[in-house]
C-alpha cells in the first residue's frame, strides 16, 4: 500500500488503516456469510476491502478519491462480486444505489473521517431499514458520544437518536500507529445492530429529533432555558406545564435525561400542541 505512490489527502481526512490485526478483527465483526451483501464506505487503498471480498456474496465500495478508484478497480478486476463506485456517499441515494445490486439487508463497513462522520451517520440512520449491522470506525471522541449514557459528558444528540434504533457497542480501540499517515488521536470501532422496533415510542420521530436537538442546543443551560421561546410550537408557560406533568425538573439539563424521558417529553409537547 505504501509503495503505490499515492499520498493521503489531508483535505479528505485520509488515514489509511494498515494494521492487519485490526483489519481482520473488523472483518470478523462485519461477519458476512456467502450470499450476503456489504456496503463499504471509503475503501481507500482496499486493505479492508480485500478481507471483506473473501466473505461477501456482493460487495459495493464507494470511494470519493479519483486517484484511488483506478487502483481499487485494478485490484479487484478479477472478482465479479466486487463493485467500485466513484462518488461521494453523501450524494448517493442509498436506497436506489444499493437496489441495483441486490435486496436488503446489507451490512456496512466504514472508516469515517472526522469531517464527514456526522452527516454520514445521519444518512445511515435514515436508511436503517436497509441494514442488518453497521461496523464503523470513528474518531474516539465521536464513538464515545454514540455509545454514551445519560449523565456523561459525551452524552448528546447522537447518543439519543442512535440508541433509539440501535444497540451500540464499542468493540475495538485503534491506536494511531495502526494508520498511515499516523493521526494524532485514537479511533474506535463501533458495532451497531438495528432494533426490530424503536426502543421506546416517541410519538412523532421528526418532532422527537427537534426536541432532542433543542435540549442539547445550549449544554450549560437548563431544559427550561433550552426549550422555552416557542420554537417547538408550545408557548413558554406550556413548556413548564409539560415538564411538570412528565415529572422532569425544569432545572435539569438535557444530558441528564434518559431515552424514555425524552420520549415522554416529546409526547407531552405534542399533546400540548407542539408542531414542526
Curated annotation (Swiss-Prot):
InterPro entries (UniProt xref): KsgA/Erm, rRNA_Ade_diMease-like_C, rRNA_Ade_Mease_Trfase_CS, rRNA_Ade_methylase_Trfase_N, rRNA_adenine_dimethylase, SAM-dependent_MTases_sf
Keywords for this protein: Cytoplasm, Methyltransferase, RNA-binding, rRNA processing, S-adenosyl-L-methionine, Transferase
Role noted for this protein: Specifically dimethylates two adjacent adenosines (A1518 and A1519) in the loop of a conserved hairpin near the 3'-end of 16S rRNA in the 30S particle. May play a critical role in biogenesis of 30S subunits.
Compartments in which it is found: Cytoplasm
Gene symbol of the encoding locus: rsmA
Listed CDD domains: AdoMet_MTases
GO cellular component annotations of the record: cytosol
GO BP, one annotated term: rRNA methylation
Catalytic activity: adenosine(1518)/adenosine(1519) in 16S rRNA + 4 S-adenosyl-L-methionine = N(6)-dimethyladenosine(1518)/N(6)-dimethyladenosine(1519) in 16S rRNA + 4 S-adenosyl-L-homocysteine + 4 H(+)
SUPFAM superfamilies according to UniProt: S-adenosyl-L-methionine-dependent methyltransferases
Family indicated by similarity: Belongs to the class I-like SAM-binding methyltransferase superfamily. rRNA adenine N(6)-methyltransferase family. RsmA subfamily.
The protein's name: Ribosomal RNA small subunit methyltransferase A
Organism: Geobacter sulfurreducens (strain ATCC 51573 / DSM 12127 / PCA)
HAMAP family to which the protein is assigned, alphabetical: 16SrRNA_methyltr_A (MF_00607)
Top-level taxon in the UniProt lineage: Bacteria
Binding residues for S-adenosyl-L-methionine: 15, 17, 42, 63, 88, 111
UniProt xrefs under Pfam families: RrnaAD (PF00398)
EC code: 2.1.1.182
An example Gene Ontology molecular-function term: 16S rRNA (adenine(1518)-N(6)/adenine(1519)-N(6))-dimethyltransferase activity
Amino acid at each position: 500500500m505504501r509503495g503505490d505512490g499515492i499520498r493521503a489527502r489531508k483535505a479528505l481526512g485520509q488515514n489509511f488503516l494498515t494494521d492487519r490485526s485490526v483489519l481482520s478483527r473488523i472483518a470478523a465483526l462485519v461477519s458476512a456469510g456467502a450470499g450476503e451483501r456489504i456496503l463499504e464506505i471509503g475503501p481507500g487503498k482496499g486493505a479492508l476491502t480485500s478481507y471483506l471480498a473473501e466473505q461477501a456474496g456482493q460487495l459495493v465500495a464507494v470511494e470519493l478519491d479519483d486517484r484511488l478508484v483506478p487502483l481499487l478497480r485494478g485490484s479487484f478486476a478479477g472478482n465479479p462480486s466486487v463493485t467500485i463506485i466513484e462518488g461521494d456517499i453523501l450524494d448517493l441515494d442509498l436506497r436506489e444505489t444499493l437496489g441495483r445490486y441486490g435486496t436488503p439487508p446489507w451490512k456496512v463497513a466504514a472508516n469515517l473521517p472526522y469531517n464527514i462522520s456526522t452527516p454520514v451517520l445521519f444518512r445511515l440512520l435514515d436508511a436503517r431499514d436497509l441494514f442488518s449491522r453497521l461496523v464503523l470506525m470513528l474518531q474516539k471522541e465521536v464513538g464515545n458520544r454514540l455509545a454514551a449514557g445519560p449523565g456523561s459528558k459525551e452524552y448528546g444528540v447522537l447518543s439519543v437518536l442512535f440508541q433509539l434504533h440501535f444497540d451500540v457497542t464499542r468493540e475495538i480501540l485503534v491506536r494511531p500507529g495502526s494508520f498511515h499517515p499516523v493521526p494524532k488521536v485514537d479511533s474506535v470501532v463501533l458495532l451497531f445492530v438495528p432494533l426490530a422496533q424503536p426502543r421506546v415510542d416517541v410519538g412523532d420521530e421528526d418532532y422527537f429529533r427537534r426536541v432532542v436537538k433543542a435540549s442539547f442546543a445550549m449544554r450549560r443551560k437548563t431544559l427550561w432555558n433550552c426549550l422555552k421561546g416557542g420554537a417547538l410550537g408550545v408557548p413558554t408557560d406550556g413548556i413548564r406545564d409539560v415538564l411538570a406533568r412528565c415529572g422532569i425538573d425544569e432545572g435539569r439539563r438535557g444530558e441528564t435525561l434518559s431515552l424514555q424521558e425524552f420520549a415522554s417529553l416529546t409526547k407531552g409537547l405534542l399533546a400540548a400542541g407542539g408542531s414542526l
